[in-house]
Amino acid sequence: MTVTAYIALAVLAIMIYLIIKQYETRLVLLGGGLILCLISLQPMQGLHSFATNMVNGSLITAICSAQGFAYTASYTNCDRSLVYYLSRPIRNLGLFLIPLCAIITFFINIAIPSAVGVGAVVGSTLIPLMLRAGIKPAAAAAAVLSGTMGSLLSPGLSHNAYVSEMAGMGIMDLISYHSVYSFMIGGVAAVGVFLVCMFLGDHKGEKVDVNNTDDGFVPSPIRALVPLVPIVLMLVCTVWFPELKMGVTEAMLLGTIACLIVAHPDAQIFSKKFFQGMGDSYGEIMGIIISAGVLAAGLMASGLIDALIKVMVASSDVARWGGSFGPFLLSIIMGSGDAGAMAFNGTVTPHASEFGMSIEGLGSLAFLAGACGRTASPIAGITILLAGLAHANPFDVVKRTIAPMFVATILLAIFMV
């Protein structure tokens, strides 16, 4: 390796330390990338990458429209209605609430692709439900946390848009490609957390009388259907009416219109919520993609990626395990399933064919493994949120998820590529 490649390794180590210390992820990615470009005497590479990713049309439209729809569904309580009706039949199932709550969260997360968003909505209902049944707080939080990988099957997930564009295929085609593996790790998570909680005796806790805040919420069966509208539209049009070319943006806009018609809220506030969601998603999600792109440019300029690719070309097993456990470990350390997977997919995945893999295969492997790592991270935002809702320690929560996620990552590496 070159001198700059060794410097890049040192910079990466410092970046990981800063992220562990809870420095702002986008700042660390952006700063590290620009420093590497400067050290490599190619300062414009990082700036060009920033400018290019800022206007990535297919990513912006899919991500921003999906988040805009999610904000309107939250404002009109359509998401809470969906959770309410899905959770009613399972109130008295005792220990079996753990896998069932994980499964319910998984499917709701497909409709609401934000892990933190679905955690707030689902957790506020299902966690008190489990606490009342005598399930320990850490186990209740872990059950919901293990279900937050349903977004892998959502057309609004940024990774689906990113990898599908790189592979030159439609978003629904990519989801169809990795759906079996996404369901596999979802099943491993639900069953695995259930077994760990049973081993730890988490169903033998005291029944807690949790009083939900009476905020005037009244569930509506019609509103409960609204979060499902975009997904149903895309599935129906993809299978039976492909000539309509129903994209993510069109489906999300139609879902937003359905939300407005069904809930008939204050139209002005509704409009503000939609565009607030679009703006927030650009800053939060696109911000990570843009910053990861700058880091990717820095790693390329330093020569570290070229050295890594040579190693992977020499052995496909290195690519298989590196593409799975690399993002998995980075996501545990960073507390984000996005940053590590985005950096890997922006640098290594475009060269997948050189070590006998497809772009969609390696790219999907990276972000599925990244999701597993985030679900096993005590510093992930969703873990901290759910631990707070359950009044549990985040480390006690991931004690129940890390083993199933480790097993899921091994299975991905074995079967996916």
What are these regions (language model features)?
Residues 57-63, 174-190, 244-253, 361-370:
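Alpha-helical transmembrane segments
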Residues 62-65, 91-127, 289-292, 315-355, ...:
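Hydrophobic alpha-helical transmembrane segments of multi-pass integral membrane proteins
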Residues 22-25, 58-59, 70-80, 109-121, ...:
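Short helix-coil transition sites and intra-membrane helix breaks within transmembrane domains
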Residues 128-222, 382-416:
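Membrane-core helix-loop-helix motifs of multi-pass transport proteins
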Residues 94-108, 133-153, 174-178, 183, ...:
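Alpha-helical transmembrane segments of multi-pass membrane proteins
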Residues 2-5, 55-60, 87-103, 132-140, ...:
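Membrane-interfacial loop-to-helix junctions in multi-pass transporters
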Residues 1-72, 81-85, 89-91, 230-290, ...:
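Hydrophobic transmembrane alpha-helices of multi-pass solute/ion transporters
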Residues 82-84, 116-129, 157-168, 338-351, ...:
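Re-entrant/interfacial helical elements at transmembrane boundaries that shape
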